[in-house]
C-alpha cells in the first residue's frame, strides 16, 4: 500500500537509467511560494492587455507612463513580499535536499528584493539558492534557456540531465528546462489546465512538491544515499543513565551532572524517554538539552514516539522541543510513531504542530511510511 501511495504521489513519466543528481533549480511563484499577486488587477491598473507580457508592455510605454506602471508593479510586489507564504511541503523538501547534499538554484521573474526577502525570512536556516536569478539580471526570460545554461556553467556540470528544473508552469518552466537539456518536474497545481492541459513532456509530475523527494530517490543516485546499515543496540554506561532507565529519582539527584551524555551519546533524558520512565522526565527535562541528538541522532522525543510512551511524550512536549528533528537516518518522531502504529503518539504529535510533510531518507512522509490506514488518514486529514 505504501508503494502504491508513493506511485500516486510522484508519477514518473519516463524511466531513464539512474544518473547522479547534482542540482535542482526552482521556479518561485506557485512552486515554492503560494501565488499572492492579483495579476488581473495589476494588468488593469497598468493598462496592459492580459494577453501581453506586462514587463515587455511597460518597456514599450512612453517614459512617464512606464514610470507610473512600474511604480504600480513595485507597490503590488512589495505587498506581495509582506504576505509571502511557502507552499505546503516546500521547506521540508528543501531540508531533504540539503541533507542529501544537493545544491539548489532559483530562476524567477520576481525582483532581487523578493529573493532577498525570501532568504531572510521564510528560507532562514536553509542553504541559500546559488545562483538566484531574478528579472533584475540580464538574461532572457523563461522559457529562453540562457539563465539555466548559466547555472549549469556556474555549477560546472557537463551533463544537463544530472539537474532537475522544478516549476508549476508547463509553458515556462518545463519548456525552459527541456530547452536546456535538464530533467523536468512539474508541480501540478492546476496551472497546466489554464495553459491548455499539456504537461509539455515533463519528466515527473507531482501534486505536491514534497512528493518529488520519493521520485528523486527512485530516479537518481543521490550524493549521500549510502546503503542502510545495521547498528548495535546500546545500553546506558553512566550511573545517571542507569538511574534514568530505572526511573530512580533519588539516584539521579545524587549524580554530579545529569546533563552529560554517556559513551553512546545518549543523555539521561533520552534513556528515560526510551524506557518510559515518566516519573523522572520533569527532573531531567529541566536539566538536559531536550533537543540533544543521541545515539544515531535520535532525540528523547524520537525515542518516546518510537516506543509508544505517550505519558513521556506529553511531558516532553511541554518543553521547547523541536518536534520535527530527525535522527541520522532522517526519521522524524512522526515517522517513528506512524511506522510503529502508535496511534496516541501520532495524535499527540499532530496536536503539537508536527510537520505532516517531513521526509525520511527515501523521501517518504510519515503518511507513506505506515501500513496503518487509520494513522495515514489522520496525517493526510491534518494537512
Q: What is the predicted function of each stretch?
A:
Residues 2-23, 95, 111-113, 117-235:
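Asp-based, Mg2+/Mn2+-dependent phosphohydrolase catalytic module
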Residues 10-63:
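Active-site neighborhood of HAD-like aspartate-dependent phosphohydrolases
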Amino acid at each position: 500500500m505504501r508503494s502504491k501511495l508513493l506511485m500516486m504521489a510522484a508519477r514518473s513519466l519516463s524511466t531513464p537509467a539512474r544518473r547522479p543528481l547534482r542540482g535542482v533549480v526552482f521556479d518561485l511563484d506557485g512552486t515554492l511560494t503560494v501565488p499572492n499577486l492579483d495579476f488581473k488587477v495589476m494588468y488593469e491598473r497598468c493598462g496592459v492587455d492580459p494577453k501581453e507580457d506586462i514587463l515587455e508592455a511597460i518597456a514599450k510605454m512612453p517614459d512617464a507612463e512606464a514610470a507610473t506602471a512600474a511604480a504600480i508593479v513595485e507597490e503590488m510586489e512589495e505587498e506581495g513580499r509582506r504576505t509571502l507564504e511557502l507552499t505546503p511541503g516546500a521547506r521540508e523538501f528543501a531540508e531533504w535536499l540539503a541533507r542529501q547534499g544537493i545544491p539548489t538554484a532559483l530562476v524567477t521573474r520576481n525582483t532581487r528584493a523578493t529573493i532577498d526577502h525570501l532568504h531572510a525570512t521564510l528560507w532562514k536556516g536553509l542553504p541559500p539558492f546559488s545562483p538566484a536569478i531574478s528579472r533584475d539580471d540580464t538574461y532572457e526570460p523563461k522559457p529562453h534557456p540562457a539563465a539555466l545554461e548559466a547555472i549549469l556553467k556556474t555549477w560546472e556540470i557537463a551533463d544537463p540531465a544530472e539537474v532537475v528544473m522544478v516549476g508549476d508552469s508547463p509553458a515556462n518552466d518545463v519548456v525552459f528546462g527541456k530547452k536546456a537539456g535538464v530533467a523536468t518536474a512539474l508541480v501540478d497545481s492546476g496551472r497546466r489546465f489554464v495553459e491548455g492541459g499539456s504537461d509539455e513532456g515533463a519528466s515527473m509530475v507531482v501534486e505536491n512538491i514534497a512528493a518529488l523527494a520519493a521520485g528523486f530517490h527512485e530516479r537518481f543516485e543521490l550524493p549521500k544515499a549510502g546503503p542502510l546499515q545495521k547498528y548495535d543496540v546500546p545500553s546506558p554506561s553512566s550511573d545517571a543513565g542507569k538511574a534514568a532507565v530505572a526511573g530512580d529519582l533519588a539516584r539521579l539527584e545524587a549524580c554530579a551532572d545529569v546533563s552529560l551524555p554517556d559513551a553512546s551519546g545518549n543523555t539521561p533524558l533520552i534513556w528515560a524517554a526510551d524506557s518510559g520512565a515518566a516519573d523522572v522526565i520533569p527532573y531531567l527535562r529541566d536539566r538536559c538539552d531536550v533537543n540533544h541528538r543521541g545515539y544515531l541522532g535520535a532525540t528523547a522525543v524520537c525515542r518516546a514516539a518510537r516506543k509508544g510512551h505517550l505519558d513521556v511524550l506529553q511531558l516532553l512536549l511541554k518543553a521547547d522541543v523541536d518536534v520535527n528533528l530527525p535522527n541520522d537516518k532522517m526519521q522524524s518522531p512522526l515517522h517513528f510513531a506512524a511506522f510503529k502504529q502508535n496511534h496516541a503518539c501520532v495524535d499527540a504529535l499532530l496536536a503539537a504542530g508536527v510537520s505532516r510533510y517531513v521526509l525520511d531518507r527515501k523521501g517518504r512522509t510519515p503518511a507513506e511510511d505506515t501500513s496503518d490506514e487509520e494513522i495515514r488518514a489522520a496525517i493526510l486529514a491534518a494537512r
